[in-house]
Design a protein with these regions (language model features):
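A short beta-strand motif that forms part of the nucleic acid-binding face
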Residues: 167-170, 215-216
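Short linear motifs at secondary-structure transitions and domain/linker junctions
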Residues: 34-36, 123-129, 184-189, 238-244
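Metal-dependent nuclease catalytic cores that hydrolyze phosphodiester bonds in DNA/RNA
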Residues: 1-163, 170, 175-176
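Short glycine-enriched, charge-decorated loop/helix-capping segments at active-site entrances
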Residues: 76-77, 179-187
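Residue-level detection of beta-strand scaffold positions
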Residues: 163-164, 201
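Short, well-structured alpha-helical interface segments that form or flank functional binding sites
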Residues: 86, 146, 192-199
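Metal-dependent nuclease catalytic regions and adjoining charged, substrate-binding loops involved
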Residues: 9, 16, 176, 187-192, ...
Length: 277
């Protein structure tokens, strides 16, 4: 595979030399973006990821260390992901300043929040692994869950703490409400995000969440609802992890997901095809 990449690199270089100088510059910039992205890639950790819990078979592959499919991400896709990451930072920095500006919202430091919970004998299974900007890397040692928490916000008048999650979407997804097909705008949290939100709330002892959606194309914002997370919803995610654990113990992949929605961006298509339904 390395030899193939070297050959491709030489072909790109040779092609660039035949182009006008401005086009050669453009080609090399795009190539450099892709090379740097590949250098930064690494094997996923053998943990459950709340953002990838729709398909249990994918959960199984992640936690057993199945090698993801080889893929080459083009510069445009890398740029779109980078834009989403930078918007994360900008939005979180604005929220972190709201209390100082006189608004009724306070952005909580997740580690300090957890220290208060630990003192109360709660969230004892959750460890802080570090920070990346304003996001906090967390690990649930009993359920083997790792995740990046966007934050927790406090509504100052009531003192209520709510999970905060930010999603950057293309126009189609941003304007689509999968719980109300006739809606002209998003009025519910996307079903695809419910596992993630419920798992975060379970781990952090929170009962409600605010999910802020941004339209990637024009930067419009929407917070469609206060998402209520019941004890039953939290337990359902725990049960899903425990069920997957049972497959891991037997070294038998779970059945395929009932529909192909999670398959589009799945990194384990080769292994999944090999194991069949």
């Amino acid at each position: 595979m390395n030899n193939t990449r070297r050959k491709l690199g030489k072909l790109v270089t040779a092609s660039a030399k035949k182009q006008p100088l401005n086009k050669a510059f453009l080609t090399d910039v795009m190539s450099a973006i892709e090379v740097l992205d590949r250098k930064g890639s690494r094997m996923p950790s053998k943990t459950y990821k709340p953002s990838s819990m729709v398909c249990m078979r994918q959960m199984y592959y992640q936690v057993t260390g199945e090698k993801p499919d080889e893929s080459r991400t083009d510069y445009a896709s890398i740029g779109m992901a980078d834009t989403g990451t930078r918007r994360h930072v900008a939005i979180q920095e604005a929220i972190a300043s709201m209390a100082e500006l006189g608004y009724d919202w306070k952005y909580l430091d997740v580690e300090e929040y957890l220290r208060e919970k630990w003192a109360q004998g709660k969230c004892l299974d959750v460890q802080v692994r570090g920070k990346r900007g304003v996001e906090t890397s967390l690990y649930h040692k009993t359920l083997n869950i790792s995740f990046m928490c966007d934050g927790i916000v406090r509504y100052i008048p009531s003192g209520e703490n709510l999970l905060f999650e930010f999603k950057n979407q293309i126009s189609f997804k941003y304007s689509h409400d999968d719980k109300d097909r006739g809606a002209v705008s998003k009025s519910h949290v996307d079903e695809a995000h419910e596992d993630q939100i419920c798992t975060y709330c379970m781990a952090l002892d929170l009962d409600r969440a605010l999910v802020l959606y941004e339209n990637r194309d024009n930067c419009n914002l929407e917070c469609p609802e206060v998402f209520e997370v019941t004890p039953e919803m939290k337990q359902a995610r725990v049960d899903k992890i425990l069920e997957c654990d049972s497959y891991v113990e037997r070294q038998v992949p779970p059945p395929m997901h009932f529909d192909s929605k999670p398959c589009r961006w799945c990194q384990y298509k080769t292994a999944c095809k090999k194991h069949g339904r």
